[in-house]
Structure formats: structure tokens, C-alpha cells
Amino acid sequence: MSSYAYVTVIYGNNIYLTGALVLGYTLQQTNTKYDRVILATKDVSEEYRSYLKKYYTHIIDIDYVKVNEDIFLEENTRFHDVFTKLSCLSLTQYDKIILLDLDMIIAKNIDHLFKLSAPAACLKRFHIPYGQKIPPKMICSNGKLVGSINAGLMLLEPDKREWEDIKKDIVKENFIGKFKYPEQDYLSLRYCNKWTSITFNYNFQFGLTHRVKKYHYTIDNIYVIHFSSSYKPWNRLNSDKSLREDETDFFDQHIKYYNLWMNIYSKIKHDFSKNDIKLPY
């Protein structure tokens, strides 16, 4: 077992399986030296796990993590189970982990990120040079959030005591505040004076066109592509789901990124079909 690992999380049986396969496949293609771990809630079926084994070195069972509902700023939030992904902090067999969202493509090898001090992530809205400490004043002031990191890609150090403390914290009745992006805002505040900067080309959200233009990022000089909007690439695989006009416009505007994801997924389906295996999507 390596001292470092890439970690992602899958909840239940649903179309997010496609994201997990694309993420795992692209990680594998970068020839990383380190483990590729997927944490799976116990309602992920054996069938789905059999697909995931092709691209992940370890599949580890986890339980859903519940929180005090007062933590959510939006009543019908899509982030109800999002703190479950912080179960990765219990993986103390690793010195450091990189936690990744499923809606990502790893375009180039990123093993060098493990050399940074943890915790590390990309600061939203502002540029801090790679590897530098993010000034606390850009994240919090007087115990309140004024900025945030993006939690789609984070370098973390597993710590079971820290994880137990977080689990106690997020069920408190007198929780510190309401968050639109719950685990992201919570961790931003919790580690306000500890964050190291990972630059935008390691968490490339192509929908943020002002940042894309300002720093001249293109599909050729980025490491990780993040489909962070609600317009997920696998929506096009779901024939039962009709796209809204704004979704269609967004897809059309950023078609090269969605086509890249679709081409990778088509290759994955083809690889499985060689063994007479038909994926559910």
C-alpha cells in the first residue's frame, strides 16, 4: 500500500456511476504511483462494485453521515449527504490523500500535489500562487466566512480524532452558521489559517469564464477538468431527462469539454463490451 492515495465517494446506485468510471479511468491513464480509492455507501450494489474494480485499487464501505439540518442554507439542497465524503479522514493508513469529486477528468498526472502542505485547495474568486499559504483574511474574518476554497479537489491529512470531532460538531444544536455549499464552507472556516493554494488549473471550472480568460487557461494547459455546475455530462446519457433551455445553451457553449467526457465514457463502454459486459447507462 502506498503512503498516498486519491479518494472519491459514490452514494447508492445511480448515474453517478458513470462519473466514477470516468474519474477512475482518467486517473489510471496518468500512470499515478498511488492508490485509487473509492468510498462506497453500503447501498452501492455488487454489480456496480464489479464495474468500479476495473479502475480503483480499493473499494471501502462507509456509512452515510448525517448532520444538523440547520447547517443548510437552502431547504431543498442537493448537498444533504455531502459530509459523508469527509469519511476519507478516517483513512489513516495514508499520510496524505487527495479527495476528488466524481464530476472530474484528470487530464495530466498530479502526483506532485502530494508534496504540498495539507490542507490545500483552490481559493474561489482570487488567485494565490501555487504552493503559497492562503492569507486567512481572504477566507474568514471575526469567525465568519468571507471567502471559500473549492472542495472538489482537496489535499488532506487523514486523522481519526479530527474526523470524530467534525462528526460531533456538525450535529450540534447551536451550529455556527448556515452554508450554501455545506462541507466546502465548513472546511474553509475550520481550517481558515491553514490552507495552501492549489491553482485554478488543477480545479478547472470552465463555466467560470472570467477566470478562464484572465489566466489564459485552455484545454491544453490544465490538469483537472471539473464539471462543477449542475449541468453534468452524464445528463446526456439519460434519455428520460429533457434538458432545459439554459442547460442546452451551457452545453453548447462548452461543448468541447462535454464531448471529451463523452468520448472517454464511450471508450470505457467499449472496453467493457469486449468482455460482453453492458453498463447500465
UniProtKB/Swiss-Prot annotation:
Its GO CC terms are:
membrane
| Species name | Acanthamoeba polyphaga mimivirus (APMV)
Q: Which InterPro entries match?
A: Glyco_trans_8, GNT1/Glycosyltrans_8, Nucleotide-diphossugar_trans
List the PANTHER family: GLYCOGENIN SUBFAMILY MEMBER (PTHR11183)
- What are the UniProt keywords, alphabetically? Membrane, Transmembrane, Transmembrane helix
The protein depicted here goes by the name Uncharacterized protein R707
What SUPFAM superfamilies does this protein's entry cite? Answer: Nucleotide-diphospho-sugar transferases
Segments traversing the membrane:
5-27
